[in-house]
Amino acid sequence: MGSKRRVILLPTLGVVVLAIAAAVLLHAGEAADVANGQFARASGTRFTVGGRPFYSNGFNAYWLMYMASDPGDRSKAAGVLQQAASLRATLVRTWAFSDGGYRPLQKSPGVYNEDMFMGLDFVIAEAKKRGLYLILSLVNNWDGFGGKKQYVQWARDQGHNLGSDDDFFRSDVTKQFYKNHAVLTRVNKITGVAYKDDPTIFAWELINEPRCQSDLSGKTLQAWVTEMAGYVKSVDPNHMVEIGLEGFYGESMHKNFNPGYTVGTDFIANNLVPAVDFATIHSYPDQWVSGASSDEQVAFMRKWMADHIRDSAAVLRKPLLVTEFGWSARSNGYTVAARDAYFRTVYDAVYASAREGGACAGGLFWQVMAPGMESWTDGYEVVLERSKSTADVVAHQCARIAGLSPA
């Protein structure tokens, strides 16, 4: 896709020119907000930047730090961030963790790989140059890049008797490991700005997709979220905090809205924690209701979004972001046209909410990859240069979202 985008045809050439010029000016204003030190805030059910409403569109690229840590692959990270700016996206979500294993950020508790940290420095600096905000996730629930499993193993290596990976949420040892993770106070060696003082960071995410199957009551995760959200805020009061939830309901209300099971989270109770600034959901009906038809899966997604948008406004009174959604090429009946239609359906729901002053203020699809990353594919990847129709859908949403933000 590069720096090109599809022009949506309007009745007259003059209107087309004015619309494109307005969108460019809006993105230039958002870029200036990042450059001029404007932190994103949550105000009621809206995000604001510099006192003005802020709406977002963008994507996930979890691998940015990893690729940027290798000078030979750094262009992949820079190229994808440039694509985001060219599309007039405003927000990218990525990992600020890699625990143990091959080329880690954190080799062992509190011991860091400077090359990997320099990769994260580079990502933040490049995002800032392009007027992009970043959501940085601090640890993984899953085994990829270490995750809670690695934290538990580190505790065991020190002689602590932890039974399951879910003890990550309960053990004082692993909780201290988490608190000691030095990302928040890192001083970027490219910009000279501490992460906690850098407005390029939109929000900290406590953990990617937390689940606690050993305590489906939700009490374990509720206690952990309360403690860690408060801790992150105590170290960094400048930035917003979100949990990283997929959106599964729990004991407080609406368990019947789940896709047939619970995972130890509680969308309502977890997000009502005062130190949590906004709610998130993910949407993967091709996984969660895999036995349903494509039409039934899309219907589930529509209801999933509508329920969470309503509850974010009426119960939480906080903004909502769809921080992951996608459609896998490995799903039955997949076509690029079907994926594009799914993206449009998600985007229409996001846009309708944002336009009408609802709680949902943006969506980030999973995920963008750069050319030459074939070994990283998971079925959900979008290589924008090779997926023109999907890139057009994304560009159209970016333009619509930009049009909602006052100049």
Swiss-Prot record:
The keyword Hydrolase applies. The active site is at E209, E324. It is an enzyme of class 3 (hydrolase). Residues 1-31 form the signal peptide. Gene3D superfamilies: Glycosidases. Expression not detected. Its EC number is 3.2.1.78. Substrate binds at W95, N208, Y284, W366. It is found in: Secreted. It catalyses: Random hydrolysis of (1->4)-beta-D-mannosidic linkages in mannans, galactomannans and glucomannans. Keywords: Glycosidase, Hydrolase, Secreted, Signal. The keyword Aminoacyl-tRNA synthetase does not apply. Its main location: secreted. GO terms for cellular component: extracellular region. GO terms for molecular function: mannan endo-1,4-beta-mannosidase activity. One of its GO terms (biological process) is polysaccharide catabolic process. InterPro entries: Glyco_hydro_5 (IPR001547), Glycoside_hydrolase_SF (IPR017853), MAN-like (IPR045053). Belongs to the glycosyl hydrolase 5 (cellulase A) family. This is Putative mannan endo-1,4-beta-mannosidase 9. The gene is MAN9.
